[in-house]
Amino acid sequence: GKDVTHRWPELCDLAGSVNASTAILDAELVVFDDHGRPDFGLVQQSGFGTDREAVLHVFDVLSIDRTDTIGLAYLDRRRLLEALVEPSDNWLIPAHRVGDGTALLAATAAHQLEGVIAKRVDSVYHPGTRAKDWIKIKNRTVVELVVGGYTEGTGHRAGTFGALLL
């Protein structure tokens, strides 16, 4: 892998907040926009002299002190994770909720967030694959538009639309 430590120095102290000698965590860097919403584009810009700091969202634990945890149920891994990582301003364990997913999805829509990841509480971790036990449910925005034209596709889009002119 490529060392990118210099881009996010705010994350360098994470190891000191992990209550183990070694751990493998599943996490994602998040940078928030001016409205407090995650913005992937800002993640790409962060660490290059911008004033926006990234926050590491730690979702899961795959190993603790060289002991594999991927075969444990999600709720068991979640309990281990909460005992393992001490949150700070620069990393956190996002809140999770059991039940009433419909209300949670509606709340994310009201805040103009992307959606939720629904996980079976008894699911094991499947590295490198999409598992049916974890489903990404996105909020959809419906907009009525008039199509004024299109461009022809090229490359992998050959024989289809390249772009719609709206």
Language model feature labels by segment:
Residues 1-165:
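Catalytic cores of nucleic-acid ligases and guanylyltransferases
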